[in-house]
Amino acid sequence: MSAVEEIYQYTMNSSARLKREDVELSLEEKAEICSELELQQKSTDIAANIIGDISSLPIVGKIVGTMAAAMMAIAHVGSGALDIQQTLLGCSDLPFDEIKEIMEQKFNEIDRKLDSHSKALEEITKLAEKTLSSVEKTRKQMNKRFDEVLESIKNTNIAPIVSKISNFGRYFDXEAERIRGLNLNDYVAKLEEEKGILYYLRESRTPKGDGLHAPLLIIINEGYAIPASINDELAFKALDALLYGTQTYVSVMFFLLEQYSFLANYYYGKGELDIYNKYFDSITNIFLDFKSSLVGSGGSDSAALLESVLQVLVAVKSKEFLKFLEMDVVVMLNEKISLFSKIKEDVDGKERITSSLTPENYVHISFEKDIPTPFGDWKEDKEVRYAVQYESETLFSKVSHWSNPITVRGKACPTLRMPVDQNRKSILVFRKFENRKPQLVGSVSPYQSNFIDIDRDLYNAAGNPDLDVGHXEVVKLVANGANIKAPFEQGRTALHAAAESGNAKVMFGLVLXSLGDLNKPDKNGFTAIHAAADKGNAGIVNLLIDYSASVNVKTYRTLQTPLHLAARRGFKRTFDRLLESPDININEKDKDGFTPLHSAVLGGKEIVKAFINQPGTDINAKSEKGLTPFHLAIINDDWPVAETLLTSESLQVNANDENNNTPLHYAVMLGHLEIMKKLINLSQVNVNAVSIPNLWSALHYAIFFKRDDVTLELLKILKVDKDLQSLGGITPLHLAVSLGRKTVVSEMVRIGINLEQKTTEDFTPLHLAAMSKYPEIVTFLIDQGSNMEAKTANGATPLLLATLKGREQASMILLGNEVNFRAVDKDGQMPIHGAAMNGMLEIAREIINLEPSIVAAQNNNLDTPLNLAAQHLHPEMVKFLVGRKADINTKNKDGNAPLLAFSKMGNLDMIKFLISNGADVYIADNDGLNFFYYAVRHGHLNIIKYAMSERKFTWSTPDNNRRRECPNEECAISHFAVCDAIQYGKINVVKYFVGTLQHFSICRPLITAAMYGQLDIVKYLVEEEELNVNVAKPGTPLCHAAENGYLDVVKYLVENGXEINRDCVRGETAIDMAISKNHINVVRYLVKKGADLRRRNALGSTPFFTAVSSNSLDIARYFINEKIGDIDINEQNEKGESALHLAVYYRNLQMVKLLVENGINVGIRNAIGKTALEIARDARFSRIVEYLNTKSRRFRKGFQILRNAQGYPHMNMISNFIGSKNIEHDHQRFLNSDVEESKTFLNSPSFQNIDVIGTLLLVDVLIRYFTKQGYINEENDSASDEGVQAAALEITENFENFLNVFDDTPKEQVDLTEVHRKVYAALKSGRKSQIHQVLCSSLKSVSKLEPAEIETLVSELLNLQSSFPLTKFPPSTAEAFENSLHILGESCLNSEWSPSLMLM
């Protein structure tokens, strides 16, 4: 596998990591390992999904994280993916507490967002999330493999650069994840730390310190990320780092915007506008700074990061050697190009994300209202100031400076005068009394200059719970013009304020004045009745209902009704008032499918009882996830509520959710022991109900969630089925053993559960224990008499499984009990094999001490313990086995041997050890590769030098193991070694072979390097070793580079003297080689550099003909569209075949279409007289026949003549079938005659696409072919009647052949007898022009041009002054005439002849 495939198809040896008994894996590591076993346990992804599913879940706060974690675990086990293998390896051993912590952090984040009621913040958050959703997933996946990348590039020049990128990314990920889970106060404090995370991340875009920008620029500017060959591992790893770093850079930008937006919104909500302004400036500057770095500024993006990265990606994608890699690599490159292009477009398309405008604060304050102080917030001698801000729903805008303070003297509610805004924007007005929190007091329209600060006081008065004071103030303010509909924070009006405060006196007055607006929602969809219900103001609710307020109106986000809110709060009186409405829907569902009764579970037993007593209540209503109110009561550990629900005879205690989980399942998984006991005691509860699809009972869940107290209680219950088998035959005992629940296992044994229970794959509890990380369970089961020789369906014993899974302690315990270590499974595996492959030296020593000969045991793949130890890279085990006389030259079915394994890994010490102990240096695998070749291919120069200097083998020995690679001669090891070094791009090895050892002639190094696209090696050989770039053995380096599509190598060779038109093989040149493999970029370059497009190779083909015969559609199109002057589209080979013939032979319909649509002569016949259409018919190529039939009746493309007119008269289509070389010259006078008269007509739009010159020449051709001699004057009329008849008949037959091309043309439309008569008459009378008219008029059924236009055209074209005698035409002339007729037909095809042209 190449380096790029290793990076982009990243795989890890999960079993090796799972074997580490003493290492506790993190949640992320375990999730990753288990996903490799198809568990699909993606913790954070599942967490996000669950939060989306239960965002309105009516459960108490302390339960929410636990409940979400439980649901996440259910999703995990309910996926049906948990099999016995995962259970044994600890994948099922979910870190529940860690999941709970994750979920609680996620809910903290959600709570913060719900408290942030800012559209501007939402817009920035949406922008960030939209971009980050496409960036973050792959970026974090890339981050996981950086350890291996760093290890593989250790001691290289890019290592420090990649390390910086990796370190920055990990710091960013860790800190960002950590702060997201903080509660509000801690979150704000963390963000505002001096020189904390926000400061550090802002600095990361500067080219200093440990930032991110500098290392990315180094990779780009130094070209580290552009691979020179398929094996350029460093370049591919640098590319990986560049992509990861760039995605991190984008993530940092949007993370900063999110956090500063949050801070701005946070302080705006608190009314601390000065701090808000500070963070507003931060948002603006961050966006503009990062935008400049990412996409450039000032009209140039040449130095911008995203453009530079895109250029790198395009350069990598253009590498021809990518075609040898898996398609995933190309797909990845395309995805990254698309991703960064979209980000660039999105960022560049936004001028800014904050408003650039700040209104001037020209407020002039005067007190004109007769409202004496003290009144509301207006207190005598207090100072008041004002500030203004442009109103914007979607952009943050800056708040102006505060006005000079005005002292309150006797009056309240001043008038503010300000100039009309020049930007024609609405303006928000804020006021602040001394050091108190500022308040929004209103909005000024674009053309308003006076503003009375009175509406906020009305809103505040409405919110005053003191009935009399609030009412008195409202009355006074309304009398002075206050607007009761004025909106304030979140779009709430005085109606909302009164509903919340419960001031019935104020509310009554407002209701009377707002009858049409009682259902008006705020920005979150809360109406006045929502506000009243949420606060338990039953009187207000009643008042609103009396005045027809809607009782079923829903909020925007959660779609909750007033009844949901009242029920959640437990407001019984409010509930009663709502239920008095005849319109109430007691079972109305919110966004997640929860009814008010679900919400009532939080409100307590009294409100639940009220629901139960209400007719029509659906007591078993299910949410979208299938949860009933009874489920929620159990989840909340609230038995009084559950008991209240049980009073209803309709209650279904075994109701199941979408995973078939009953309330009992939830009680068990959440560890609610007392609730569980009460449920078990209910006669109607099904204690053995199972979930789907894994068929788990409550007992399974109790064990899985490690609720030992619950499990032990369940084991006491007689009706609990202790042996219930779930999917895969897994019983509770199997789960308890695999999860290491020793107390549970002991109790199960005590009550007599069968220890030999088997899964569907015949695993016993002891098998599972042997594979698990709990050796104490192994000991316990053995002590209880478990069968130590039991076999699985595959024939594995507990000991074999323990060794295969690397469980050394379990293996030693079993060996100590004298189990059969010779037992073999169906794969031929024995415990010694497992011990060897896992490096368990003590186990291997114990087994071999018992039976020394077992060291030679082979499994079904012919692997011995020694070979397995070598393949899994356990040097000490290898040395031990060699010391025990293991066959050092052992090979498995693939030919893998110990020496080869360590050569691949570059372990020189083990190479020396094995060779010194008799390893055969010539031993090769099934591909013929020995240890030396592997050292070469992997670039292990130390092993190569050791082998060469110590003369461990003969360099010149013929190697028959690779004879198929060298079929025509005996090739030595030296040949293959040098070839391999070049092919795999190991330049240090090449320098050693060619430079140090002077092996210039072995493997034609320069040709081989060019053949495999190894540019660095090509440069080295040309520049340092001065090899000839035109060496040919056979073919030059340029030929081979062109054939294989290595454009960079082709360019280098051409620039350094390679002859472009030099022969390769069979008379082909480099361009032929490139065309044959469809390398269009190489073809374009070679043409640009002078490749001869008219040269024919040994097969008689020009490059254009080669493109067609090679089915290289893109190249053929390139020649036709861009190089028409250098090719002949109608060229024929020695067999008379045209390009169209070849396209038909290869059944290439697309090529046929390209040629026909670009004017190829479809009537050309090959050496046996066949046209392309006839060949297609003979071969029954129906689609091509159908196409050619259709196209043959259409007018030849008009742009053909435009090409002919561009300086290439020799390419005129008429010249393809006429003998006269001077025909164009002979008629120049005709073409130039009467220019002014014809110019207007011929240049009219109707004739812009007509081949006029071709038609003019056609008439001449007809005449010349009729006479063979040229023009004869009218007086010479020596033709006999027989000759005229014969000529007329031949013309008519040719015309009939022309008509036969149109298979669907009704023959009755053309009377050939009449055509013959008219042609004969025209010939006999010498009226030559009428022949053309006769033939064209016969095609009138398909004509399109206006009659007048056709008549004018014909009169101009046929104005010739001669007649001609008729003779018998030879075949060649007849064929040419037929072609002429074909073109003539096309020139008439779109013509509608007027009656005046219907002759005789």
Curated annotation (Swiss-Prot):
The protein's job, in short, is: Presynaptic neurotoxin that causes massive release of neurotransmitters from vertebrate (but not invertebrate) nerve terminals and endocrine cells via a complex mechanism involving activation of receptor(s) and toxin insertion into the plasma membrane with subsequent pore formation. Binds to neurexin-1-alpha (NRXN1) in a calcium dependent manner, adhesion G protein-coupled receptor L1 (ADGRL1, also termed latrophilin-1 and calcium-independent receptor of latrotoxin (CIRL)), and receptor-type tyrosine-protein phosphatase S (PTPRS), also termed PTP sigma.
Per the record, which residues fall in region Furin-like endopeptidase recognition region? 17-20, 1194-1197
Q: What is one process in the GO biological process aspect for this record? A: exocytosis
Q: Per the entry's comment, what about the domains?
A: The H8 helix is predicted to insert into membranes and form pores by assembling into tetramers. The helix is contained within a helical bundle domain that undergoes significant conformational changes during pore formation to allow exposure of the H8 transmembrane helix and transition of the toxin from a soluble monomer to a transmembrane tetramer.
Disulfide pairs here are none
Location within or outside the cell: Secreted; Target cell membrane
User: Per UniProt, which keywords does this protein have?
Assistant: ANK repeat, Exocytosis, Membrane, Neurotoxin, Presynaptic neurotoxin, Repeat, Secreted, Signal, Target cell membrane, Target membrane, Toxin
What does the subunit section of this Swiss-Prot or TrEMBL entry state? Answer: Homotetramer in membranes.
Q: Which family does it belong to?
A: Belongs to the cationic peptide 01 (latrotoxin) family. 03 (alpha-latrotoxin) subfamily.
- How would you summarize where this protein is expressed among tissues? Expressed in venom gland, cephalothorax, and abdomen tissues from both males and females.
Please list the GO terms describing molecular function: toxin activity
Q: Where do the ANK repeat units fall?
A: 490-520, 524-553, 558-588, 592-621, 625-655, 659-689, 694-726, 728-757, 761-790, 794-823, 827-856, 861-890, 894-923, 927-957, 969-1001, 1002-1031, 1033-1062, 1066-1095, 1099-1129, 1135-1164, 1168-1197
Give the protein's recorded name: Alpha-latrotoxin-Sg1a
Region Helix H8 is the probable transmembrane region of the tetrameric pore inserted in the target cell membrane, annotated ranges: 238-257
RNA-binding recorded as keyword: no
